[in-house]
Amino acid sequence: MKYNQWISISDMMAGIMMIFLLITVSFMLITQKAQEDLRVQNQKLLEINEAMSSIAKDYSDLRQELYEALLKEFGKDLKVWDASIDEDNTIRFNEPEVLFDIGAKQVKKRFKDILDDFFPRYVKILALEKFQNSIEEIRIEGHTSQVWFAANTLEERYLGNAELSQARALEVLKYCFNLKSINSYKEWLVKVFRANGLSFAKPLEDDDKSRRVEFRVITKANKDLLKILDISKDFELK
C-alpha cells in the first residue's frame, strides 16, 4: 500500500514538473517570438524614419537649389516689378495698383507687360528636369484685403473677396497660358498649372499689400511623406 502511494506521489510530482517545464518552454518561445516581432518592427520603423529623413533632405536641397535659380534669373527684375521671392520660393507681386483696379478682375496693362517677361522665364526654369519631376503644382494664388464695399457681415466680406480673388487668379492663369512663348510647355502645364483664390485668408501686415498675386510651387514631397505614413500604420506597435 505504502509502495503504491509512493508511486502515485512520484508520478504526481513528475507530472507537476513536466507541467512547469512545458510552461517554461512555452514562455521562452513566446518571449523569443515577441523579441523577434519587436526586432522586425524596430527595423521597419528605422527604415521608415530613414525614408522620411531622405525625403525631407531631398526637399530641402531642391528648395534651396530652386531658390538660387529663381534669384539668379529674376534678382535684377524684382525691384522693378515690386516683387519678392520668399524662402519657400513663392514669388509675390506686391503692388496692387499695378495688378488690378479696385474691385476688378481684369489684368492691367502694366501687369501684362510684367507677365510677358516673367512667366516664360519662370516656366523655363521649372521645366528643367531636376525640378519638373518633383513639381506637383504651379499655383497662382489671388489674395485680397479684408475690405468689401457695402458689406455688413464677415460672410459678405469673405465671400465677395473669395469670388474676386478667384476671378483674378484665373485671369492671370488665362493670360499666362495663352502666351505663345510657352507653347512647348503647355502639355505639361495642363497637368500642374492651377489658379486659387484665397480671399483674405492669408493677410499681410499691410492691408493694401494683402491685395496681391503669388506664384507658388507645390512639390511632391508632401504626397511622398503621406505614402510613407500610410505604410507605417501597418507597423505600429500593438
Residue ranges and their predicted role:
Residues M1-Q64:
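Short terminal targeting/anchoring segments
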Residues D82, A127-Q132, Y185-K186, E205-D206:
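Surface-exposed acidic, glycine-flexible loop patches that form ligand/cofactor-binding
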Residues L66-L78:
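Functionally critical alpha/beta secondary-structure elements and their flanking flexible loops
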Residues D77, K130-I135, S184-V192:
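Short helix-terminating capping/connector loops at secondary-structure junctions
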Residues K105-K109, I114, H143-N222, L226-L229:
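Periplasmic OmpA-like peptidoglycan-binding domain that tethers envelope proteins to the cell wall
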Residues I91-A104, T153-E156:
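Acidic/histidine-rich, surface-exposed loop or edge segments in extracytoplasmic proteins
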